[in-house]
Design a protein with these regions (language model features):
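Short linear elements at protein peripheries
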Residues: 217-237
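A transmembrane-helix-recognition feature enriched in membrane-embedded lipid enzymes
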Residues: 197-219
């Protein structure tokens, strides 16, 4: 092969690599644009439903306050993040926001039970046991909201979680058929928040799709009326 042909072949290879690189960059930018567009839409859609505590207590006919689970320590102690969610939800209950509390979290094994830890904490704070319902299969934000509507029959709810997570939670509930509002737990700076913010940015797009196609959650079950006693949910349903 002549030197001229070799240089031409090498030049063609370099151009091909460059074109592939530019194509991948263009795809990445389009994906980023799509994710950002969904993020902005969801934030704008839900923003009027994010309330201060005093505004939430002024709502009428709220079926329940939904407190979303988070990690527990040593099997029986709420993590700081979960404790702050519980404190806000309990404050709303005591202020008359709703007659019942629905605690939704992960009870995926006999060795890990977020919701029982949550209920025990609330009882120690003076909330009657019969006013606390447990959703043992709230394995994700989407599943918690799906089950709140499908299993517990909730129609109008106030959701409590941290501010960074609240938009997605309310969006899920709203698009699964509930009149949903949200109140953020106390704005504490927890370690690793930057990573959580990035995950939430991606999770908003995931749940945007989930609420469009509406797949059933991992676990369903028989209906449970919020008009009865929450003690019927003390065991896994």
């Amino acid at each position: 092969m002549s030197k001229k042909k070799a240089e031409k072949k090498k030049g063609g290879f370099v151009r091909a690599i460059r074109n592939i690189f530019l194509f991948l960059i263009a795809c990445a930018l389009l994906i980023l644009l799509g994710l950002t567009g969904i993020y902005i839409y969801v934030k704008h859609d839900v923003n009027p439903r994010l309330l201060k505590e005093e505004d939430a207590t002024a709502l009428s006919d709220v079926d329940c306050i939904i407190i979303l689970g988070a990690s527990v320590k040593n099997g029986d102690t709420p993590s700081p993040m979960l404790r702050d969610r519980l404190d806000e939800g309990i404050a709303l209950y005591k202020a008359g926001c709703a007659p019942k509390i629905l605690m939704s979290g992960d009870h995926g094994s006999e060795y890990y039970n977020e919701v029982s830890v949550m209920k025990n904490y609330a009882i120690k704070q003076g909330v009657p046991s019969e006013d606390i319902f447990l959703d043992h299969a709230g394995f994700s934000t989407y599943e918690s909201m799906y089950r709140a509507r499908a299993i517990f029959g909730a129609e109008k709810v106030v959701i409590v979680t941290q501010k960074y997570h609240l938009t997605r939670a309310v969006y899920n509930a709203k698009n699964l058929g509930m009149d949903a509002y949200g109140v953020a737990a106390a704005p504490i700076n927890y370690g690793g928040q930057t990573i959580r913010n990035i995950r939430e940015y991606l999770a908003i797009s995931k749940d945007f799709v989930m609420t469009f196609i509406k797949p059933e959650p991992t676990v369903l079950g028989n209906p449970i009326s919020l008009d009865g006693s929450g003690d019927v949910t003390n065991g896994a349903d």
